[in-house]
Amino acid sequence: DGKIKNEYKQADFIKLSVKKLNELGLRDKTKTKLTVPEIRSGGSLNVKNIEFKFNGIDEGLFFKNISFEMGKIYGIVGKNGKGKSTLLRCLVGCERKSKDEIYLDGKRLSKADRIKISSLVMQDVNHQLFTDSVIGEVGLGIKNAEIDYVEDILKKLDLYELKDCHPMSLSGGQKQRVVIASILCKDSKLLFFDEPTSGMDFYNMMNISNLINECKTNNNIIFIVSHDQEFLNSIADYIIYL
């Protein structure tokens, strides 16, 4: 039922301001420069050591003595193949080949310990859809008393009208928002997002940004891998460059 509301010649479209583009649900045409400060030490998640070697080569990930503060959002950026997604898996505890020593509030956490307190949104969200309805997926493990909160999240992500649909029947962007919604409803100490805004327009990108910010508390830490500099500028407290 879509309809054409405006038509622009190329020369006129190029002249549109960022504000006007955003009003149309479009992104900034220019390359955004990250303006948040780099990571600094101090916090309650302490990475004493992470070692991970890629198959067949000596290159890999090597981190020592890095601290992350509770109540902060960390953006992770770098070129393709630098190990951004691998770093997330190492921190979560689901990368079996990694050697690590990680502490939370002074207590050493095993891989199994970290998995229990972590939530992860992967790039391919098809691996994270398990139920036969959107509301069932987002509310999985949520008490009935909190169903109003689940429905509120669905409304904010334009998913409420799809709440009875099977998740696998949705578009790629809708599936992505379903998984993000399910993660935001969980009370995890460590939240990990791998390219959560890929392919999203400005409107949905800002919805995701606002919701993640709302979920930031003094009792959790959020890590976001993204090539979306506009998104990271809107949300990240610190940036990790790989």
Regions found by a protein language model. Give the residues of each.
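H-loop/switch region of ABC-family ATPase nucleotide-binding domains
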Residues: 226-227
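Conserved ABC ATPase "signature" region
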Residues: 147-162
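Conserved ABC ATPase signature
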Residues: 166-170, 174
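Catalytic Walker B motif of ABC-type/P-loop ATPase nucleotide-binding domains
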Residues: 191-194
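The feature captures the beta-strand-to-loop junction immediately N-terminal to the Walker
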Residues: 77-79
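Helix-to-loop junction immediately C-terminal to a conserved catalytic motif
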Residues: 92
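ABC-family nucleotide-binding domains
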Residues: 201
